[in-house]
UniProtKB/Swiss-Prot annotation:
SUPFAM superfamilies on file: Homeodomain-like (SSF46689), RING/U-box (SSF57850)
Record SMART domains: SANT
Zn-finger region bounds: ZZ-type: 12-69
Native organism taxonomy: Eukaryota, Metazoa, Chordata, Craniata, Vertebrata
Species the sequence originates in: Rattus norvegicus (Rat)
Full protein name: Transcriptional adapter 2-alpha
Pfam families on file: Myb_DNA-binding, SWIRM, TADA2A-like_3rd, ZZ_ADA2
Amino acid sequence: MDRLGSFSNDPSDKPPCRGCSSYLMEPYIKCAECGPPPFFLCLQCFTRGFEYKKHQSDHTYEIMTSDFPVLDPSWTAQEEMALLEAVMDCGFGNWQDVANQMCTKTKEECEKHYMKHFINNPLFASTLLNLKQAEAAKTADTAIPFHSADDPPRPAFDSLLSRDMAGYMPARADFIEEFDNYAEWDLRDIDFVEDDSDILHALKMAVVDIYHSRLKERQRRKKIIRDHGLVNLRKFRLMERRYPKEVQDLYETMRRFARIVGPVEHDKFIESHALEFELRREIKRLQEYRTAGITNFCSARTYDHLKKTREEERLKRTMLSEVLQYIQDSSACQQWLRRQADIDSGLSPSVLMASNSGRRSAPPLNLTGLPGTEKLNEKEKELCQVVRLVPGAYLEYKSALLNECHKQGGLRLAQARALIKIDVNKTRKIYDFLIREGYITKA
């Protein structure tokens, strides 16, 4: 450890030569018999046979150099120390600048070596960096490898999602263009000098105070965006769509007051009104049962089934008004009757239109190169191809349905359709797939 600890790219970090007091440059000599403190000599003093007090020129010695591997055969000890110093200077994750400072390794090599030996190998890290914690590190958990986060997302520059996020840069937690982006222009020509009059000095100070107030407004807006989670606009809209239409209208109205209260209080207010709406709807349903003389839920299920049957029969009875429109035209009347007969036989109107028009069904969607494809398994890829849904949208819909199912303890198809407002047939296929694969459960 002493040997490794003496290696550094900065000569001033090493002890000076005992002969000429110059900074030591590798390789240099360490006397094996003198010390402590250690007795170091540069090559010039060693070749002259320098002697000092108890040190004699015939003492045994060691050649101090860092040109040997420690952890990896392709990495020398000097490169190991240079890597640690570069990470300390440039910051973890800034591998391009780390590689530029080292000059001998690429950024991929630096990242791979550092993650392998200093992040994912806690036993070695504790042994090398802190011997006192070696015993405790034997029972320590394995370090978690670094993975980039998906929330907020990191879209490509100038993409549609990047424009939706107003140019937000997640790595810097800042925007490309600030609110009131040209506020600094008012200060570019201001210069405080001793010859300024009192009025001119007060005027300049007033401009600075105005600039400070504009900075405070900029920070206030940033805080509102971050606290309320408004950066990821798509996720925010999905969360809003899980409410019924009446609650969505309230959500839209109360959005302007979100800046006054905190995010937790605002969410509690909306959730409480959503719960109130559900309770009112449930009370109305129970009152309908009581009016009909129903006193148990078993009878209520029979009542709902019969009510649905009556509604369907009522809709069928209105067909008489439709056929009366064609009573004067016999050919049109026969065509309408044939269409109704096909519908009664089990064919949907969409199938009839497709068969009449002769149109072909849309081909499966090609997922090659689409973002998010690598996150899908084979069954999910097949679903996206058949439904013609891009992987990114499918992952957002899946996450929204999973969260709602976990929150409610189950999910109905009607709730899924209210949550993801796309084609109802696509929603049904996604819902059936998630049920079949065990991702969600029916309510």
